[in-house]
Amino acid sequence: MREKLTKLKKTQEFKRVYSNGKTVANRFIVMYYMPNGLQVNRAGYSVSKKIGKSVVRNRVKRLLHESFRLLNSNLRQGYDVVFVARGKIAEADFHTLKESIEKLLKKTPLYEEKER
């Protein structure tokens, strides 16, 4: 069964993950994560104006969301995750971003390899 993936939207939800969560990072992304007590993973995406104009920022958010959606079946459920984009992310393609997110997730307790 496919797990549901919802988005973090409220400022209060983001602040809770920033202040209470743990962090892993690489050159494209800083990832904050913490348990949420629910049966689903929730993801939020923060892309500042330093990354580019709105078209670029929205594209980055779409790529991050799709990458996380594809990897969600390999994750333990019940976590809030916030991805914060770093400067060079606008130059990265989809496959690079997906690999980058997967490497970050493997450093956390969220990731569990499942057989297909």
From Swiss-Prot:
Key words of the record: Endonuclease, Hydrolase, Nuclease, RNA-binding, tRNA processing
Molecular function GO labels: 3'-tRNA processing endoribonuclease activity; ribonuclease P activity; tRNA binding
The UniProt record lists the keyword Signal: no
SUPFAM superfamilies (UniProt xref): Ribosomal protein S5 domain 2-like
Top-level EC class: hydrolase
Any one GO biological process: tRNA 5'-leader removal
Pfam families: Ribonuclease_P
EC number(s) on file: 3.1.26.5
PANTHER family: RIBONUCLEASE P PROTEIN COMPONENT
Subunit structure: Consists of a catalytic RNA component (M1 or rnpB) and a protein subunit.
Function: RNaseP catalyzes the removal of the 5'-leader sequence from pre-tRNA to produce the mature 5'-terminus. It can also cleave other RNA substrates such as 4.5S RNA. The protein component plays an auxiliary but essential role in vivo by binding to the 5'-leader sequence and broadening the substrate specificity of the ribozyme.
UniProt record similarity statement: Belongs to the RnpA family.
Protein name as annotated: Ribonuclease P protein component
Lineage: Bacteria, Bacillati, Bacillota, Clostridia, Thermoanaerobacterales
Encoding gene (name): rnpA
